[in-house]
UniProtKB/Swiss-Prot annotation:
GO annotation terms (biological process): maturation of SSU-rRNA from tricistronic rRNA transcript (SSU-rRNA, 5.8S rRNA, LSU-rRNA)
UniProt subcellular location: Nucleus, Nucleolus
Chain segments carrying region Disordered: 1-139
Record's function text: DEAD-box RNA helicase-like protein required for pre-18S rRNA processing, specifically at sites A0, A1, and A2.
Name of the protein described by the UniProt record: U3 small nucleolar RNA-associated protein 25
The keyword Nucleus is assigned to this record: yes
Organism of origin: Candida glabrata (strain ATCC 2001 / BCRC 20586 / JCM 3761 / NBRC 0622 / NRRL Y-65 / CBS 138)
Family affiliation: Belongs to the UTP25 family.
InterPro entries registered for this protein in UniProt: P-loop_NTPase, UTP25, UTP25_C, UTP25_NTPase-like
Amino acid sequence: MDKRGRKELRSIRRAKRTKIEPEADAGVESSGSVLEAGPAVEEKVQDDGEKEDDKEQVYNALLTILKSEHKEDKVKTHRDHDEEESEAEEEEQAEDQYNDAFADGESDDEDDDEDEQAQEQEEIESDDEEKDPFDTHFNGEEAAKHGEALGNALKDNKLRYKSIKLKVGSADEDQVQEDAIFSVPYIEGETPKIEDPKLKCSLSSYFLKKRLRIQNNLLDTESNALTDLQRKIVDPMMQYKDILYEYDTYGKDEDEYRDLYTLHVLNHVYKTRDKIIKNNQKLQDNPDSEFLDQGFTRPKVLIIAPTRDSAYQIVTKLIEKSGLDQVDKKGKFRDQFYDPSFPPSSKPKSFQHIFKGNTNDYFVLGVKFTRKAIKLYSNFYQSDIIVCSPLGLQMIVENTDKKKRQDDFLSSVEVTIIDQFHSIEYQNYTHLFTIFDHLNKIPQEQHDADFSRIRMWYINDQAKFFRQTMIFTKYISPVANSLLNIKCRNLEGRWKNHKIVSSEDSSVGTVGLKVRQIFQRFNVLGNSVADEPDYRFKFFTSVVISNITKSTGYDDGTLIYIPEYSDYVRVRNYMKEKTSILFGDINEYSEQRSLTSNRTLFNQGRLKVLLYTERLHHFRRYELKGVKNVVFYKPPSDPEFYKEVVRYIGKTVFLGDADLNISTVRCCYSKLDGLALEKIVGTKRTGVLTHGQNETYEFK
């Protein structure tokens, strides 16, 4: 990896538009989902059994990249509020991480299987395997046959999905604020079998390990009370279905779903390990017995988070839920992941939440559980859980030095969680697709696995049909849907919620500014996602630009907000080459000098038009001055951004430099923008805007 490696990987490199097409897979619906799978931590993989050459390979990619010399411009790495760690600090951290990960002579209480079995055998035997989703999903014969059939159907392009809609909340349709869409895979030519999922809305039916019930005060059924959010997702989560969940508020909602999924993954890790211990004892009694209870490698859970601050909160919650007091390298973890800093109070609350603490987006952390301790910074192949950022893991699985490239440790991941997807999407989201390409592949090397105990669906390359994926996001986007539809194949099906947005709660309804808001629709022939950018550009240059040049209102103060960087480049080049408009442009890659000068010239009216990208707004949240008109080239991905940008006009009016009766907001959209429009104008209005006879709609 050269000096530019990390900088380039953080940069937006738009893949072909077809990559995020909701219908990119034949027969796959846009109702998202997620994939998971379950048991099997290889007890054979012990610290004292690891070979030194394996150790050298695991973090080698991470170490090499961190050591590479590079300079990162603050604008390009989007750290307005937080200083970059120095290169020397990164080198020192990489050295320490490497040394800790591969240190020899580590005492491992987990090796004491006999004591473990004696203490836990009663609990292990008490599990009802016939009813426990853990066993029916990962160890059931019916599930194995179904996975094999789906694997053949996928190869033959005959895999399809059938969906049903479930009401969530009030039985009164006028009061319903949320739907759930449940989709199951089936084979073309066969009659799809889909039934309403069993909703228990409680943890008491899901066989949590006794140690977790004790630690988290869940022994008493009455104390199992869940929040409204948790009641909605507990059943699909514990039944190992894929989940795409859109939540409402930062902080509170994130704490609630993390409380639930940390319990789930701990339960999964413990059951995986206990099953192996149980079968080990059976093999001692009867060596001729056969038990298929393992995968190729030990890591079973992958948690992807946007920043070190998010990772710190997640790992801290895992420690808290586990009840284990001994945590190796806890101080080091706090030093490298915790930061008490907070963004300025003048910034929006959402910005303060996303960018608080340590915003470094480059990390990979192995977490290992033993009977008495949690070991942080553990060797990947000895870890139960891997917590990472998309960039951090991508730099390992796609290392430019093929000798240092590693992805075998992802071969047996059974639960994948993407936390705060909306924030990750503003990084380079293509890293997520890359990571999913490396999940559940058959390893290139043997890593001390006992092949006599590896499940057949691992050997037959069908693990992706057993993996559970859970995605949590502030708002569902086409990219989130695409990731689920293309990369997630869980045989248990997909569960996705759909928030019903009233007109009063929409961005238009809560903007608090009585300004003309005009929505103009353009048509896309065949509703092709691949062709949509061309139709949008043609509409913008032929209709919107002419309105700007022939405006009967203000001849300056027009802000053009462009979500996609590739669209921004295209519009900028057109305005430079084909028009005589005096304009400036600022984007996430602009130097600070350019950012400052263009904003000043625009405020003074010396630049009539200013091009402004969504990623710059996400990472900076500028208070732009001098805005009299706003043009949205495309509806903002985040509905909060719509209100923030429109309110720029209000500030100009307050200063006496504009009149609300003259100022306008114009938004270009097509039928394919339904997801974004729904949050901006409301669910019912979106149906009218996308399918109504008129092509122009106005709100005030």
